[in-house]
C-alpha cells in the first residue's frame, strides 16, 4: 500500500558547520496563516511507476519546495512507510522520509518551484538547540502552532535520531 503523500525531514550537513534542520513557512489556508512546515506533497501518478515511488516523490518535493536537487553525496531513507494523520477523521496517510544533504557549502534555497496554490514565506535553518526550544515551547518563533509532521521532524532532529 502506498501512502497518499510524503513528508520530508531535511537535514543540511555542511562541511565545518553545525547540522541544520530545513523548515519553511507555508501558508495553510484552513489555519489562515503561515505555518512551520517540512517539504511535503502528494504522490503523483507518475511516482507510482518509479522503482521507489516514495523516494521519487520526496526528491520532487524537495526540488519544488526548496530548489535543492539530490546529489550522489546525499542520503535518503524511509523513517516510516505510512503514518495516518488523523485516523479518527480521515484516511489520509504520509510516508515520512529523511533526507541528509551532505554538502561542501550551503546550497541555494528557493521557493520558486511552488505549484498550484502553494504559498511560501521563507526558510528556517534550525540548529539542534533551536529545534529543542520550539519543541519545548510548543509553538514556533512567531507564536504559531505547527503541524504534526513538523513536530516529527523537530523530534527526529532535536533528539539526534537522524544520526
Indicate where each model-derived feature is located.
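Conserved Nudix-box catalytic region and its N-terminal flanking loop in Nudix hydrolases
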Residues: 1-12, 16-60, 81, 115-117
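Nudix hydrolase/Nudix homology domain
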Residues: 34, 39-41, 79, 89-90, ...
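A contiguous pocket-lining binding segment that forms or flanks enzyme active sites
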Residues: 54-113
Amino acid at each position: 500500500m502506498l501512502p497518499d503523500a510524503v513528508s520530508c525531514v531535511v537535514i543540511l550537513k555542511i562541511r565545518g558547520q553545525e547540522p541544520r534542520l530545513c523548515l519553511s513557512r507555508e501558508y495553510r489556508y484552513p489555519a489562515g496563516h503561515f505555518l512551520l512546515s517540512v517539504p511535503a506533497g502528494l504522490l503523483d501518478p507518475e511516482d507510482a511507476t518509479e522503482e521507489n515511488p516514495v523516494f521519487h516523490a520526496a526528491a520532487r518535493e524537495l526540488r519544488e519546495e526548496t530548489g535543492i536537487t539530490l546529489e550522489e553525496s546525499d542520503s535518503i531513507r524511509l523513517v516510516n512507510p505510512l503514518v495516518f494523520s488523523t485516523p479518527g477523521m480521515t484516511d489520509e496517510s504520509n510516508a515520512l522520509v529523511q533526507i541528509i544533504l551532505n554538502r561542501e557549502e550551503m546550497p541555494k534555497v528557493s521557493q520558486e518551484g511552488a505549484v498550484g496554490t502553494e504559498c511560501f514565506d521563507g526558510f528556517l535553518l534550525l540548529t539542534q538547540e533551536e529545534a529543542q526550544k520550539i519543541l519545548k515551547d510548543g509553538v514556533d518563533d512567531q507564536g504559531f502552532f505547527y503541524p504534526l509532521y513538523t513536530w516529527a521532524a523537530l523530534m527526529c532532529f532535536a533528539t539526534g535520531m537522524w544520526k
